Amino acid sequence: MIALFVLMGLMAAASASSCCSSEDRANVMHNWDAAWSAAYSDRRVALAQAVFASLFSRDAAAQGLFSGVSADNPDSADFRAHCVRVVNGLDVAINMLNDPAVLNEQLAHLSAQHQARAGVAAAHFDVMAEAFAEVMPQVSSCFSSDSWNRCFARIANGISAGL
């Protein structure tokens, strides 16, 4: 009987460590607001470009997935605008974390968009997670990496479903 309780406790701990809890959501929204709020609109392009620079440094082949938006010229208006569009998509998802039904619909929509793009794989979202995990502590004080990782995984797993 004790073994059963130990097993249940371990399962609960494992589940909690991968769940984007209400506390995690609050931390992520606070961290995100510190980086992406309207008060910081002048640095949005730089933040988005930094994420993509980190992505491409981790997976150079991923740059080819963005050839249609001039990824070979990261300072082009076309690519900078795309970077901001991607991060704005994350902004929308983060702001839906407290409304799971709406978030699920949004993630399904984004998933369909990514499924339609040749070459995009679920593994790319792991690399994108690493890129954000590198950049976010630089732009958000008191950054909570554990909360960020759990909630980003919730979003990324929803978008990469079906890839």
Swiss-Prot record:
Pfam families attached to this UniProt entry = Globin (PF00042)
Principal subcellular localization? secreted
Q: Any keyword Iron?
A: yes
Cysteine pairings via disulfide bonds: C20-C151
- Domain (Globin) spans 19-163
Which key words are in the record?
Answer: Disulfide bond, Heme, Iron, Metal-binding, Oxygen transport, Secreted, Signal, Transport
**So which residues are the signal peptide here?**
1-16
Please list the residues that bind hydrogen sulfide: C83
Matching InterPro entries, A to Z?
Globin, Globin-like_sf, Globin/Proto, Haemoglobin_extracell, Mb-like_M
Select a single GO molecular function from the record's annotations and give it.
oxygen carrier activity
Q: Which PROSITE patterns match?
A: GLOBIN (PS01033)
Question: According to its UniProt entry, what is the function of this protein?
Answer: The extracellular giant hemoglobin is able to bind and transport oxygen and hydrosulfide simultaneously and reversibly at two different sites.
Concerning its family, UniProt says: Belongs to the globin family.
Protein name (Swiss-Prot/TrEMBL): Extracellular giant hemoglobin major globin subunit B2
Organism encoding this protein = Oligobrachia mashikoi
